[in-house]
Structure formats: structure tokens, C-alpha cells
Amino acid sequence: MAHKKAGGSTNNGRDSESKRLGVKRFGGESVLAGNILVRQRGTKFHAGINVGIGKDHTLFAKATGVVKFEKKGPKMRSFITIVAE
């Protein structure tokens, strides 16, 4: 009799949901206080003037104004500031 051995099971075949990280408001954009600027893991971007940081390192606007990206310091870190209007 012709028989076929049963195929083995696999541990693959699933993926995690995307976390929708990244910059949400770009340089030159007008924002309101409370708007989320960046969702990130760790501090790829640092909080500058009028910008707050959440417990998951999310950066948000503390004041209404215009978004400005800048690199400063000896390590040329990226800072996001809000220039108040």
C-alpha cells in the first residue's frame, strides 16, 4: 500500500501588529498643545523647548506653535522644539 507520512507541525506563521511608530508632525507644521509629535522606542529624538516626553518616550507639544527640528550638543542629538506663535 502507498502511504504518505504525516507532515510535521511548524512554529512559524504569525507576526506582531505594527506599532505605528515615527514622526507624526514634521518641521514647519503648526501644532496645538497636546499634539503628538513623535512616537518612538527610546530617545531617538529628544524633547526641546515646549515639548514634553511621555513614559513610552512619546514627544508631545506643550504649547501651540510651529515644530522645529534641530541637532545640537557634542553628540549632535536631534531635538524637537515648538516655536510659540
From Swiss-Prot:
<dbReference type="GO" id="GO:0022625">
    <property type="term" value="C:cytosolic large ribosomal subunit"/>
</dbReference>
<feature type="region of interest" description="Disordered">
    <location>
        <begin position="1"/>
        <end position="22"/>
    </location>
</feature>
<dbReference type="Pfam" id="PF01016">
    <property type="entry name" value="Ribosomal_L27"/>
</dbReference>
<keyword id="KW-0689">Ribosomal protein</keyword>
<comment type="similarity">
    <text>Belongs to the bacterial ribosomal protein bL27 family.</text>
</comment>
<dbReference type="GO" id="GO:0006412">
    <property type="term" value="P:translation"/>
</dbReference>
<protein>
    <recommendedName>
        <fullName>Large ribosomal subunit protein bL27</fullName>
    </recommendedName>
</protein>
<dbReference type="InterPro" id="IPR018261">
    <property type="entry name" value="Ribosomal_bL27_CS"/>
</dbReference>
<keyword id="KW-0687">Ribonucleoprotein</keyword>
<dbReference type="InterPro" id="IPR001684">
    <property type="entry name" value="Ribosomal_bL27"/>
</dbReference>
<dbReference type="GO" id="GO:0003735">
    <property type="term" value="F:structural constituent of ribosome"/>
</dbReference>
